[in-house]
Design a protein with these regions (language model features):
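Intrinsic low-complexity, intrinsically disordered or marginally ordered coil/linker segments
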Residues: 1-312
Length: 312
């Protein structure tokens, strides 16, 4: 398990309905980028197995098997839809709201939802089985992945099950990329494409881009303060800057992680970084008569009472 970095964001002069921000913090609403990821994995496998083929010959050096079956035999709508999805995938499309809707339409019109496991040929099943064995922990989002047959059919049922957004999902603030999401957390599938682990560290500042244990500790008419944790490191500058631009006004950010002995404060105004400082934590003295005692954090002064805890 990681050390946890404690974060506090204080929004001031919020320019839109507070409820929009509260909904994002709470999570639970339909997650378009998670749906695009799930459907994208299925369409990727459909291409690798030759179930779907593009309308024209294609070349994809990161994973040649994706287009190794050549072009479709005719110009039917399912092939048009798959070709449109493939073009966005190969371009590394960012999963913003508009693109996610386009990708979902491609998935629907490809008719891949009707290709349940029992209808696939043995060669098609074998391709999917081999790739799933390689990526099941990433794609199945579980330490105990489902059998490939059940997992594949669950993808076919995706029209009825839209994944829920996680609390404070930073991928809703700065969109991730379709190809990176298919390559997934551990990567190793698409040559030259980052793993989502590496991408998340670069883009969001932390390896799991959501706010854990999110708690709104104050909410006024146009102000809101939320405490949350992130693994190892604070949420990145670009994310908080984007939040300040999206919701207007100013956002103050305090963070601390006592295991790494660091803390920081930043202020963002309408999408721009106004202040950014970091420092080491300051410590009191441990009780010399108690071998189990641990010194208290005593500074810097600006971090005291501005985070819910000091991480670790």
């Amino acid at each position: 398990m990681p050390n946890w970095c404690a974060n506090r964001l204080m929004f001031n002069d919020i320019s839109q309905d507070n409820n929009v921000l509260k909904t994002w913090i709470a999570g639970g609403q339909p997650s378009l980028h998670r749906r695009a990821r799930k459907e994208g994995i299925q369409l990727f496998l459909a291409g690798c197995a030759g179930i779907l083929r593009p309308l024209t010959e294609q070349c994809y050096p990161p994973f040649p098997q994706l287009v190794a079956h050549g072009m479709a035999a005719d110009n039917r709508p399912s092939g048009q839809a798959y070709s449109a999805w493939l073009a966005m995938f190969m371009a590394g499309a960012e999963l913003n709201v508009e693109t996610c809707h386009k990708l979902h339409q491609c998935w629907q019109e490809s008719l891949i939802c009707h290709a349940r496991w029992a209808t696939l040929s043995e060669p098609e099943q074998q391709v999917i089985r081999q790739l799933y064995q390689q990526k099941s922990f990433d794609w199945g989002d579980s330490f105990r992945p489902a059998p490939v047959e059940a997992w594949w059919d669950s993808l076919c049922d995706g029209e009825n099950i839209t994944p829920a957004a996680e609390p404070m999902d930073f991928r809703d603030v700065l969109p991730t990329r379709l190809d990176i999401e298919v390559n997934a957390f551990n990567g190793g599938l698409l040559t030259g494409i980052p793993s989502s682990y590496d991408h998340y560290l670069t883009r969001y500042g932390c390896k799991w881009p959501v706010g854990y244990e999110a708690n709104i500790c104050f909410a006024g008419e146009n102000t809101l303060t939320v405490d949350f944790d992130t693994p190892w490191s604070p949420v990145g500058e670009d994310v908080v800057a984007a939040l300040s631009k999206q919701y207007g006004g100013e956002v103050d950010h305090w963070f601390a992680e006592q295991g790494g002995n660091y803390c920081g404060y930043a202020r963002y105004v309408s999408g721009e970084t106004d202040v950014y400082i970091t420092d080491e934590l300051e410590w009191g003295e441990a009780d010399p008569d108690d071998e189990d005692s641990f010194p208290d954090v005593t500074g810097p002064e600006w971090i005291i009472n501005n985070v819910a805890h000091f991480g670790g």
